[in-house]
Amino acid sequence: MQIKSRIRTIAHYPHEGIMFRDITTLLKDPVGLRATIQEIASRYKSMKIDKVAGIESRGFIIGAPVAYELGVGFVPVRKKGKLPAETRGRDYQLEYGSDRIEIHVDAIQKGDRVLLVDDLIATGGTAEAAAGLIHEMGGEVVECSFVIDLPDIGGRARLEDQGLKVFALCEFEGN
C-alpha cells in the first residue's frame, strides 16, 4: 500500500512557501486508513507496549485505533486546559512564543512502555515535550511514530539527539 500517494499536498498553506501535507485524503479513504493503522500497529505487536499516547489532535485519530489494535489503553496529550482532571504539564517553545501540553496525572504509571503517536513530525518540538513529560511521569517512550516525516525541517534528528527512536511511514522533502 502506497500511503504517501494518498496524502494531498496544498501549496502555500497556511503561509506562503509552505507545502501543507493534508492527511484528510488518507483518512477519508477506508483502504488507506486501514493500511495506515495496521502498518503502524503491526510494527509494535511484539514490543510489549502498555499505552499509546497521541498528540492533539491528529495524533488522536491515528493513536486511538493503533491502541485498539494493540489491545492497550490510549492517553491523550492535550493542550493546556483541555483535560478535566488533575494534570501534569510541560512547556515548550514555538517559533513565536511558547505553549504547554498536559496529561492526566493518572494516565502514565511508573514503568509503562509508551508508544508516542502523531500524524506528522516537522520541528519535533511538541513530540519532544510530550516524550519528556511521559518520562517525567515514569514512563518509557519506546518509539515516536508518525505517518509523515518532513526530514528537511529536522524534527527526527532533534528527537534522535534526545535518545528517542523515531519511525515514520513516509517522508516528504521540503517544508
From Swiss-Prot:
<dbReference type="Pfam" id="PF00156">
    <property type="entry name" value="Pribosyltran"/>
</dbReference>
<dbReference type="GO" id="GO:0005737">
    <property type="term" value="C:cytoplasm"/>
</dbReference>
<comment type="function">
    <text>Catalyzes a salvage reaction resulting in the formation of AMP, that is energically less costly than de novo synthesis.</text>
</comment>
<dbReference type="GO" id="GO:0006168">
    <property type="term" value="P:adenine salvage"/>
</dbReference>
<dbReference type="GO" id="GO:0003999">
    <property type="term" value="F:adenine phosphoribosyltransferase activity"/>
</dbReference>
<dbReference type="InterPro" id="IPR050120">
    <property type="entry name" value="Adenine_PRTase"/>
</dbReference>
<comment type="similarity">
    <text>Belongs to the purine/pyrimidine phosphoribosyltransferase family.</text>
</comment>
<comment type="subunit">
    <text>Homodimer.</text>
</comment>
<dbReference type="GO" id="GO:0044209">
    <property type="term" value="P:AMP salvage"/>
</dbReference>
<dbReference type="GO" id="GO:0006166">
    <property type="term" value="P:purine ribonucleoside salvage"/>
</dbReference>
<keyword id="KW-0963">Cytoplasm</keyword>
<dbReference type="InterPro" id="IPR000836">
    <property type="entry name" value="PRibTrfase_dom"/>
</dbReference>
<comment type="pathway">
    <text>Purine metabolism; AMP biosynthesis via salvage pathway; AMP from adenine: step 1/1.</text>
</comment>
<dbReference type="InterPro" id="IPR029057">
    <property type="entry name" value="PRTase-like"/>
</dbReference>
<dbReference type="InterPro" id="IPR005764">
    <property type="entry name" value="Ade_phspho_trans"/>
</dbReference>
<keyword id="KW-0328">Glycosyltransferase</keyword>
<keyword id="KW-0660">Purine salvage</keyword>
<keyword id="KW-0808">Transferase</keyword>
<protein>
    <recommendedName>
        <fullName>Adenine phosphoribosyltransferase</fullName>
        <ecNumber>2.4.2.7</ecNumber>
    </recommendedName>
</protein>
